[in-house]
Each structure stands twice: as structure tokens, then as C-alpha cells.
Amino acid sequence: MAQTPAFDKPKVELHVHLDGSIKPETILYYGRRRGIALPANTAEGLLNVIGMDKPLTLPDFLAKFDYYMPAIAGCREAIKRIAYEFVEMKAKEGVVYVEVRYSPHLLANSKVEPIPWNQAEGDLTPDEVVALVGQGLQEGERDFGVKARSILCCMRHQPNWSPKVVELCKKYQQQTVVAIDLAGDETIPGSSLLPGHVQAYQEAVKSGIHRTVHAGEVGSAEVVKEAVDILKTERLGHGYHTLEDQALYNRLRQENMHFEICPWSSYLTGAWKPDTEHAVIRLKNDQANYSLNTDDPLIFKSTLDTDYQMTKRDMGFTEEEFKRLNINAAKSSFLPEDEKRELLDLLYKAYGMPPSASAGQNL
């Protein structure tokens, strides 16, 4: 019998990677069809290699993508399909609004230097990747009733890609794209300050493109400070190490900064050591602005309920706190104000809360 969900009500998810949310069966299908060698020939076997049960370092985790991304990247049909199936997956998890992120360049094989995953050069550009993902998400939204929007990722080790990423954010604003992100290895010294990234974020500010940044996951509070002060981020991806700098944390609390928290992910990537108190407990106790998210459910062999079960069982989270954090997630979403209001109304109704509960940002 399936486990009863820890929070069986509509949910909002803001931090999840498309390329970390692919069905194993879909990877196998395109691997076979395209003649690309995979480390196993069954879904279960594939999960045993790609999936994680115990903590690894972040670089070891990132190496997991090398196993399966060649089966998907560069294939138009596969890219549209993974976006469509992603929405179906979220519908089953009780998500009513999701922002899914990905790097257009890491799914392309043309007009990208270097070409990723040892692919031969083809004719699928980052521009067309964004169009295909948008189509898949829109068809998924129509068929499964989950509102789905996308965030385009710059990669820390490829600042030369970033100017194109912000241009694609502008071009596809009407086709699901709502924001820009900076992802990848944040331990690369000074990577937040590389001119390609800084210029892309300056252009995003100028053009009214929303901004989030992976910072303080395994990097220091200094990386968080750079994300806030230099890249002008509106949300923090993870942000756990903000707590190393109490003055910074207090400032961000006052500014109502939103933390995109991924509890199960933080355990498996070693971003959080289980013998220490998880940052999310402090955020809960302070009634701060944060959400719960899966990050990369394929690799973490998880669903959103995994994160809710973990916080309920191990950290004393209550139904009331789950409601509060989802309302904060909706308020901190990158939707236009009218659509945000509709989403909040849906949540208030489902949670049996009066709409006047929206008074006060942190409820």
C-alpha cells in the first residue's frame, strides 16, 4: 500500500531541474533508439547506477549526468517529451504550480561551444531547445492541469554562454520562461563575478527578467552575498550556508529573501551534515520565507513527498507550517501579479484559510 502523503494538499515547487527529473524508461527508450550506450538496460538497473542512496560529494553527484544525458541531448523529440512527462510527474505529486529549470546549452548540439556530453555537432541550437521545452510544458499543462513555467540556467564554468541565456529569457517570456538562474559548481573561485554572468544578470535587471542563483549550497556565505549584492538575485537556490554569517542572514530575513530549500538533496550531496541542525529548522523557527523542493528527483530516487516526509518525521514540521511555506512559495514565485493572486486564492481555498490571511508577507 502506498504511503500516505505527509501533506496531501496542493503544493508549489520552485527548485527542480528538468534534466534531473527524467523517467528512467524514457532514457532507455532514446538510448536504444539512438544507439547510445547506457550503463544498464532496465529501468531498475539504470536507477542503481544513476540513483543515490547515501551521500556523495557534489562533483560525484554532478558526474551522474554523464551516464544518461547523451541519450537525451540533441534529440528534439526526447527534449519535448521529457518536459511533457515532467508535468505529468508533478501532477501525481499534488503540485499545482511548478517552476522547472535547465540549461538550454546542455541539451543542444549546435551553436554551443564546447558541445556537451561528447556529442557530434548537430543542428539543435539552445534557442530551439527552449522552444521545444516550452511546447512540452504547455501541452503538459493542458493535459494534466498543472501550471508549469521554466527558468533558464547559466552555468558557472561557462560564462560565455550566459549572454545568450538572458537573450533567450527575453525571447521566450511568453512561452513559459519566467527567470534566469546560475547553476553548476559554486566552489569555482570567483565564479559569481565572471563578467559573462555579471553582464547577463545586469541585462536581466534592466529587462525585468526575474533572477535566482544557486548559492550557499556547498559554497560559503560569501557566495550568497555575491548573489544578492552583485547579481541582484530575488531568491536563493539552497542558501544553507547563509547561516554562517548571522549579519547577512538577519539582513536577508528583513528583506524577506526566499530560500529554495531541498532537504533530501542536501543530505545526499553532503551540503548538510546530519550531525548538525539543518538550516531549514532555523528558517522554520524564525518563520522565514522558504519552500520545499526536490532538486533532482531522478538521481535522488525521490518525489516531493520524500522532502515533506523527511521534515515532518525528523524535524517536527506541522500541517500549518506546510501551508505557510507553500503560501510563501506562491508569493515568491515568478508569476505575474494577476496569476500569482489566482494561485494564492487556489491555495487559500484548498487550505481552508480566509483570503485575508494574505495580510503580512510571511504568513
Swiss-Prot record:
Main location: membrane
Effect ascribed to mutating residue 199 to P: In ADASCID; delayed-onset
Enzyme class (EC, first level): hydrolase
Residue numbers annotated as active site: 217
GO CC entries: anchoring junction; cell surface; cytoplasmic vesicle lumen; cytosol; external side of plasma membrane; lysosome; membrane; plasma membrane
Descriptive protein name: Adenosine deaminase
Organism: Homo sapiens (Human)
Disorder cited: Severe combined immunodeficiency autosomal recessive T-cell-negative/B-cell-negative/NK-cell-negative due to adenosine deaminase deficiency: An autosomal recessive disorder accounting for about 50% of non-X-linked SCIDs. SCID refers to a genetically and clinically heterogeneous group of rare congenital disorders characterized by impairment of both humoral and cell-mediated immunity, leukopenia, and low or absent antibody levels. Patients with SCID present in infancy with recurrent, persistent infections by opportunistic organisms.
Outcome of swapping residue 106 to V: In ADASCID; uncertain significance; 30% of activity; total loss of activity
GO MF annotations, alphabetized: 2'-deoxyadenosine deaminase activity; adenosine deaminase activity; deaminase activity; zinc ion binding
Consequence of substituting residue 149 to Q: In ADASCID; uncertain significance
Reported regulation of activity: Inhibited by Cu(2+) and Hg(2+), coformycin, deoxycoformycin (dCF), 2-deoxyadenosine, 6-methylaminopurine riboside, 2-3-iso-propylidene-adenosine, pentostatin, naringin and erythro-9-(2-hydroxy-3-nonyl)adenine (EHNA).
Cross-referenced NCBIfam families: aden_deam
Binding positions (Zn(2+)): 15, 17, 214, 295
